C-alpha cells in the first residue's frame, strides 16, 4: 500500500472512529446510545485501520464493535468481532492479550449456543498459552474436547483430542490423559471407528500399568469388554496378555509383549511409555523407565527365600527353650 493510500485509510478510520465514539455514548441531548449506528461506524473504522496496518486502532474499533453487537443481542457477530480484535493483538505481538480476547470470544459463542465455534476458539487460545501457562493450556484443551463432544461435532474433534492427550502424556499427567482417552472412546463409538477405539483401549491399559496400578488396568479391561469388537482384536489380546504378565510378575513376558510392532501404531508418547514398561525389581510393580533385568528379580527372590529359611532355626530354638 502506498503512503498516500495508507494516509487516506488512516484518515477514514479516524473519522469513523470518532463517529462511533460519539454515537455509543450518551449526553445531554442523547439519553440512549445508538448501538446500531455506532456498530456501522466502528466496523468501517476497524477495516480502514486494518488496511492501513494501524493495528492498535483497529483492535480498539473491533472491541467497540463487539460491545455494540453485544448490546444489540447479536452474540455471534460480537464473537467474530472479538476474534478480529484478537487477530490485531497478534499482529502487535501481544500474545497474552491475544489469548484473552479469544477466550472472551469463546464466551460469546457459548452465549449464542455455538459450542463448536467456542471449542475451536478455545483451542486457538490454548496453543498461544502453551509456553506461558501450561496448566491453563491443558485445561482449555480438555474443555475444548468436551465441547466438541457435547455439540456432536465429533468429526472435528480428532486433532484436538490427539494434541491434548499427547501434551498430557508429555508432561506426565497420566490420570488426566486416561480420563480424556475414556471420553474419546465415546467419540470413536459414535463414529464407528473401531480400529481407533481398540488402540485407545490398549493405550489406557498401558498407561495404567506404567503408573503402578494393575487394579485399574484390570478394571478398564473389564470395562472395554463392553465393546464387542475389542476382545477379538489384536489390541484386546495384547492388553489381556500384558495384564496377565504383570499379574504373574513375568519380566520376560512383559519385555516380549511390549516389543511387539503393534505398540508403534499408538500415540508417540504412549509408544515411548510402552517401550520402557517393565516390572520393578524392588516392588514387582510396573514402572515407567524401569530397566530391571530378570536376573536381578531372581536374585531378590532368592535372597528373600534365604532370609526366611535362616530365620526358621532361630524360631525353632526359641520354641524348644520355652518347652524346657
Curated annotation (Swiss-Prot):
The gene is snpC. The keyword ATP-binding does not apply. Residues 285-324 are annotated as: Disordered. It is a peripheral membrane protein. GO terms for molecular function: soluble NSF attachment protein activity; syntaxin binding. It comes from the Eukaryota. Coiled coil: none annotated. Residues 299-312 have a biased composition (Low complexity). Belongs to the SNAP family. Keywords: Cytoplasmic vesicle, ER-Golgi transport, Membrane, Protein transport, Transport. SUPFAM superfamilies: TPR-like (SSF48452). Pfam families: SNAP. Residues 285-298 have a biased composition (Polar residues). Interacts with nsfA and probably SNARE proteins. This is Gamma-soluble NSF attachment protein. InterPro entries: NSF_attach, TPR-like_helical_dom_sf. GO terms for biological process: intracellular protein transport; vesicle-mediated transport. It comes from Dictyostelium discoideum (Social amoeba). It is found in: Cytoplasmic vesicle membrane. May be required for vesicular transport between the endoplasmic reticulum and the Golgi apparatus. Involved in vesicle fusion with nsfA and probably SNARE proteins.
Amino acid at each position: 500500500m502506498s503512503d498516500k493510500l495508507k494516509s487516506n485509510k488512516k484518515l477514514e478510520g479516524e473519522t469513523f472512529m470518532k463517529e462511533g465514539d460519539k454515537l455509543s455514548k450518551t449526553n445531554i441531548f442523547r439519553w440512549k446510545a445508538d448501538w446500531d449506528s455506532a456498530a456501522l461506524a466502528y466496523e468501517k473504522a476497524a477495516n480502514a485501520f486494518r488496511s492501513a496496518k494501524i493495528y492498535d486502532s483497529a483492535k480498539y474499533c473491533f472491541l467497540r464493535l463487539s460491545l455494540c453487537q453485544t448490546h444489540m443481542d447479536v452474540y455471534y457477530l460480537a464473537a467474530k468481532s472479538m476474534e478480529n480484535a484478537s487477530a490485531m493483538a497478534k499482529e502487535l505481538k501481544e500474545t497474552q492479550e491475544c489469548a484473552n480476547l479469544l477466550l472472551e470470544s469463546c464466551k460469546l459463542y457459548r452465549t449464542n449456543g455455538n459450542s463448536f465455534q467456542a471449542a475451536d476458539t478455545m483451542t486457538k487460545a490454548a496453543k498461544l498459552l502453551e509456553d506461558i501457562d501450561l496448566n491453563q493450556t491443558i485445561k482449555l484443551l480438555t474443555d475444548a474436547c468436551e465441547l466438541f463432544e457435547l455439540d456432536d461435532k465429533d468429526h472435528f474433534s480428532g486433532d484436538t483430542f490427539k494434541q491434548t492427550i499427547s501434551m498430557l502424556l508429555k508432561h506426565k499427567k497420566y490420570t488426566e490423559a486416561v480420563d480424556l482417552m475414556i471420553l474419546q472412546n465415546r467419540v470413536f463409538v459414535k463414529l464407528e471407528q473401531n480400529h481407533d477405539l481398540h488402540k485407545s483401549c490398549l493405550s489406557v491399559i498401558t498407561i495404567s500399568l506404567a503408573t503402578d496400578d494393575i487394579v485399574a488396568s484390570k478394571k478398564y479391561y473389564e470395562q472395554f469388554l463392553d465393546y464387542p469388537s475389542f476382545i477379538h482384536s489384536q489390541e484386546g489380546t495384547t492388553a489381556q496378555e500384558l495384564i496377565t504378565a504383570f499379574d504373574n510378575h513375568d519380566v520376560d513376558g512383559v519385555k516380549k509383549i511390549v516389543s511387539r510392532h503393534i505398540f508403534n501404531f499408538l500415540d508417540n508418547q504412549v509408544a515411548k511409555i510402552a517401550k520402557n514398561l517393565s516390572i520393578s525389581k524392588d516392588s514387582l510393580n510396573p514402572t515407567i523407565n524401569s530397566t530391571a533385568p530378570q536376573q536381578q528379580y531372581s536374585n531378590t527372590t532368592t535372597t528373600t527365600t534365604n532370609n526366611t529359611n535362616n530365620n526358621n532355626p532361630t524360631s525353632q530354638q526359641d520354641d524348644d527353650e520355652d518347652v524346657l
